[in-house]
UniProtKB/Swiss-Prot annotation:
Record protein name field: Multidrug resistance protein MdtC
Naturally occurring in which organism (per UniProt): Klebsiella pneumoniae subsp. pneumoniae (strain ATCC 700721 / MGH 78578)
InterPro entries hit by this protein: AcrB_DN_DC_subdom, Acrflvin-R, Multidrug-R_MdtC
Gene Ontology CC annotations of this record: plasma membrane
UniProt keyword terms in alphabetical order: Cell inner membrane, Cell membrane, Membrane, Transmembrane, Transmembrane helix, Transport
């Protein structure tokens, strides 16, 4: 009593405390960062190494394996995968959530250093690492185009200046430049001219390397002066290399220009990038795992004007893709939904109270509770994201409940004629324990979420804490500010009486009367009602087992990613044509705003595309509908496939794949893996539950196998090293020298003229100078034949791996796909030497599926313990928890009706329903127990009276929660696919629960009361001797 009086009789202090909470919340709101979702990125580091010209198998065995053995010893590595292709190896290290990425980076560098002595000596540079996940979609893509500058010059500008500057911006993890390569001097050799002049390829390489050196020359000085010695030992341009003497034939000088075409070109001519229909250089910017995407994008945009000033007028710099607009639009939609929810909740209160003064009280309590929560969010290091704002939207119905319960009870005393301050004191004292029970038991629901580990726990933590803080502030407001405002604003007596005799009040009285009559009938037929309770329990279990499930709702972020996979023997020229064809088809779609893409590099038969869709208000289709439409058009392109997927805010794992979900095959027997992977992929592609099935196993590339005749080589004076050097010099784009410039270093690249590499006959023109100085054709000591070879070699851990990727067809869920894959693997009879498991998002889904039931049961158990402690009873908590099955049935039926799978968002809704629907039972049980203790009523009379007396606050709180969630169901626009499952679950559960628990709770209360009396009688009987 003294606690309530302290605030009721000191209105100024109470108002100032509430104002302080509000001001702190406003300050916290202004300081909170903005993000699409809570920070759930795994720390990921990518290690890259190159050895130009080396086959994928050579890269895997000589580069990837030594690095993997060293990197695998690092503590906290969750998963290590690698992919080796032509001349390139990339290793992805995914660390545990609690691992600091900077400390992990230091360990990675130490491991690279330790493995350095085991790596091939011919590597042009040491392995490097980046603190970025290559499988993440770029947060921004910039393009450089020009009608004046060459692609190599644009690439040089992008790589040397723009990428370096952008990489220094806070939050940027990696800037990947694509579409070409650095400028270089290319030496395209003429094999016939070399043979005629008697010059070997190795002699040309040596001559070029010796002619371009950078060494210190020292200085001269006398007693008064000092002169730095400088020579013309460096060659900078193709024109400088052209007259270089590489050999003497019969006393005549053979110059480089006599046996080769020397040009200013690029390091790797097998690269192409495009934006819409124009050649372009792409800067793909990815954020650090722990960085905020909005802040990072804003920082980049703030630097763009400065970067524009450094760009020559003939170069056009454009933003081709930006992830932030749809994120901002989604958050604006949630904020609008929050405002609408607050307005609807206050409208519900007004309809019940029909008094402006009375409505003002919860109208003040709700914003104070919600705004005050922002301060706690800031202190906890949270962000304004879709989940935290949805938590506040749902909290609207919660926080008003406490104020309603207190206000309604005080109003009841005022209508009985009690003075306002006395009514405020008496009313708040009567329901203080009820409000405390409701709030504590609601917060208890979220304790298991706070203890949940892994990605789901990280994802739900902000939601749970935000909602719990809002409920806690609401509890404080309802026991302090609300009674004070009731005591000073409301009046007693007749002014409140007519509210029950007009309009909605008359309707409510009529409904309450009908409820009383029907409740009498239900109490007389309690066995039938008991069967209904048991039926809802069984139905809720069956619905949960049968409903389709997925990890997270498929988002429409307005951005698509596409992976091109062509025939494994395709040439770069043909692949570039495929890229152009695909981009033309996509550009013609009415929903597409911008398309960029690139191909080439170490994977000649693959490419990537990034598609920006028009804003939601300018297109009628969702991202998935656009994909379905494009899929039909793209299927007609022969020799290549383009796999499209919508970019999601959550993507787990570091594997780059052409689809959203992955299933990985592992084996220590590479031949078994290569035998079974095609069979498994074919079986999965036939499943209707899967779409866009593809694999990263590419072991059918065209290869030319050369077999040396070692005896002949020995007789002719030719070593294997001589022969290998010949092939590397001729076909490996060998980097033979370095050109040093003020801002960067460039390479001299040597290979035979492309005109001689169009078919296998080029090998007939190759020759080696033997130890006697005679040219020996390759065909004299080697034979060759076509064969198949892998285009890439993949590892997970230290085992050979192949990842099958897939998307979900429209109307299918991840649970259906997972079950179909498991059935297919069983039917195929895959041997134990080949192990299959889900990876990435699909793996997290499997783990979440196993934890969902435990999580729900843990929440129920926690609520039972809290209620048992509060009521000092084992029985009454069971009565209160009997409301849950009907809510579960309503929620799951609503998801089925709206064709929405059960996702992590729907799980949040179920957890919320556990907290919401028990409030009705708490209000009934509290008043029934009070009536039994102080009113000398029988249990039947007590529960009947409690149901009638609490009917109005029960209806008010339920409708407030329902209307608070209704905007989530009805909302459209950006991000609605996240909001709708939560709203559908809550509204469906509330409707079903309200229809049933008003009748089932009294019956369950009486059942447990009779059970309690029966046990007490048995325990009180004397034991016979």
């Amino acid at each position: 009593m003294k606690f309530f009086a302290l605030f009721i009789y000191r209105p100024v202090a109470t108002i100032l405390i509430s104002l302080a909470i509000t001001l702190c919340g406003i300050l916290g709101f202004r300081l909170l960062p903005v993000a699409p979702l809570p920070q759930v990125d795994f720390p990921v580091i990518m290690v890259s190494a190159s050895l130009p010209g080396a086959s994928p198998e050579t890269m895997a065995s000589s580069v990837a394996t030594p690095l993997e053995r060293s990197l695998g010893r690092i503590a906290g590595v969750n998963e290590m995968t690698s992919s080796s292709s032509l001349g390139s190896t990339r290793i992805i290290l995914e660390f545990n959530f609690d691992r600091d990425i900077n400390g992990a980076a230091r360990d990675v560098q130490a491991a690279i250093n330790a493995a350095q002595s085991l790596l091939p000596s011919g590597m042009p540079s040491r392995p490097t690492y980046r603190k970025a996940n290559p499988s993440d979609a770029p947060i921004m893509i910039l393009t450089l185009t020009s009608d004046t500058y060459s692609q190599g010059e644009l690439y040089d500008f992008a790589s040397t200046q723009l990428a370096q500057t952008i990489a220094q911006i806070d939050g940027v993890g990696d800037v990947d430049v694509g579409g070409s390569s650095l400028p270089a001097v290319r030496v395209d050799l003429n094999p016939q001219a070399l043979f005629n002049q008697g010059v070997s390829l190795d002699a040309v390489r040596t001559a070029i390397s010796d002619a371009n050196v950078r060494k210190p020359q020292g200085a001269l000085e006398d007693s008064a002066h000092r002169w730095q010695v400088q020579t013309n030992d460096e060659l900078k341009t193709a024109a400088d290399y052209q007259p270089l003497i590489v050999h003497y034939q019969n006393g005549a000088a053979v110059r480089l220009g006599d046996v080769a075409t020397v040009s200013d070109s690029v390091q790797d001519v097998r690269n192409a990038g495009m934006t819409n229909a124009k050649p372009a250089i792409l800067l793909m910017i990815r954020k650090l795992p722990e960085a905020n995407i909005i802040q990072t994008v804003d920082s980049i945009r703030a630097r763009l004007p400065e970067l524009q000033q450094t760009i020559p007028a003939a170069i056009d710099l454009q933003i081709a893709q930006d992830r932030s607009p749809t994120i901002r639009a989604s958050l604006e939609e949630v904020e609008q939904t929050l405002v609408i929810s607050v307005a609807l909740v206050i409208l519900v209160v007004f309809l019940f109270l029909r008094s402006g003064r009375a409505t003002l009280i919860p109208a003040v309590a709700v914003p104070v509770s919600l705004i005050g929560t922002f301060a706690a969010m800031y202190l906890c290091g949270f962000s304004l994201n879709n989940l935290s704002l949805m938590a506040l939207t749902i909290a609207t119905g919660f926080v008003v409940d406490d104020a309603i319960v207190v206000l309604e009870n005080i109003s009841r005393h005022l209508e009985a004629g009690m003075k306002p301050l006395q009514a405020a004191l008496q009313g708040s004292r009567e329901v203080g324990f009820t409000v405390l029970s409701m709030s504590l038991s609601l917060v208890a629901v979220f304790l298991p979420l706070l203890l949940m580990g892994g990605l789901p726990g990280r994802l739900l933590r902000e939601f749970a804490v935000t909602l719990s803080v809002a409920i806690g502030i609401s509890l404080a407001v309802s026991l302090t500010l609300t009674p004070m405002m009731c005591g000073w604003l409301l009046k007693s007596g007749k002014p409140h009486q007519p509210t029950r005799n007009r309009g909605f009040g008359r309707l409510l009285v009529a409904v309450q009367g009908g409820y009383g009559k029907s409740l009498k009938w239900v109490l007389k037929h309690s066995r039938l009602t008991g069967l209904v309770v048991l039926g809802t329990i069984a139905l809720s279990v069956w619905l949960y087992i049968s409903i389709p499930k997925t990890f997270f709702p498929e988002q429409d972020t307005g951005v698509l990613m596409g992976g091109i996979q062509a025939d494994q023997s395709i040439s770069f020229q043909a692949m570039r044509g495929k890229l152009q064809d695909f981009m033309k088809i996509i550009r013609e779609d009415p929903a597409v705003d911008n398309v960029t893409g690139f191909t080439g590099g170490s994977r000649v038969n693959s490419g990537m595309m990034f598609i920006t869709l028009k804003p939601r208000d300018q297109r009628h289709e969702t991202a998935q509908q656009v994909i379905d439409r494009l899929r039909k058009k793209l299927a007609n392109e022969p020799g290549a496939n383009l796999f499209l997927m919508a970019v999601q805010d959550i993507r787990v794992g570091g594997r780059q794949s052409n689809a959203s979900y992955q299933y990985t095959l592992l084996s220590d027997d590479l031949s078994a893996l290569r035998e079974w992977e095609p069979k498994i992929r074919k079986a999965l592609a036939a499943l209707p539950e899967l779409a866009d099935v593809n694999s990263d196993q590419q072991d059918n590339g065209a290869e030319m196998d050369l077999v040396y005749d070692r005896d002949t080589m020995s007789r002719l004076g030719i070593s294997v090293q001589d022969a290998n050097n010949l092939l590397n010099n001729a076909f490996g784009q060998r980097q033979i020298s370095t050109i040093y410039q003020p801002l960067n270093q460039y390479k001299v690249v040597m290979e035979v003229d492309p005109a001689y590499t169009q078919d296998v006959s080029a090998l007939d023109k190759m020759f080696v100078i033997n130890s006697d100085g005679k040219p020996i054709p390759l065909a004299y000591f080697a034979k060759w034949q076509p064969a198949n070879a892998p285009l890439s070699v993949n590892h997970q851990g230290l085992s050979a791996a192949s990842t099958i990727s897939f998307n979900l067809p429209t109307g299918r869920s991840l649970s259906e796909a997972s079950e179909a894959i498991d059935r297919a693997m069983t039917q195929l009879g895959v041997p134990s030497s080949v192990r299959g498991s889900f990876a990435g998002t699909a793996q997290v889904f499997q783990q979440t599926m196993n934890a969902q039931v435990i999580l729900i049961l843990a929440a129920i158990a926690t609520v039972y313990i809290v209620l048992g402690v509060l009521y000092e009873s084992y029985v009454h908590p069971l009565t209160i928890l009997s409301t849950l099955p009907s809510a579960g049935v309503g929620a799951l039926l609503a998801l089925e009706i709206f064709d929405a799978p059960f996702s992590l968002i729907a799980l949040i809704g179920i957890m919320l329903l556990i907290g919401i629907v028990k409030k009705n039972a708490i209000m009934m049980v509290d008043f029934a127990l009070e009536a039994q203790r102080n009113g000398n009523l029988t249990p039947e009379e007590a529960i009947f009276q409690a149901c009638l007396l609490r009917f109005r606050p029960i209806m008010m709180t339920t409708l407030a929660a329902l209307f608070g969630a209704l905007p989530l169901v009805l909302s459209g626009g950006d991000g609605s696919e996240l909001r709708q499952p939560l709203g559908i679950t809550i509204v469906g559960g509330l409707v079903m629960s309200q229809l049933l628990t008003l009748y089932t709770t009294p019956v369950v209360y009486l059942f447990f009361d009779r059970l309690r009396l029966r046990f007490s009688r048995h325990s009180s009987q004397p034991v016979s001797e």
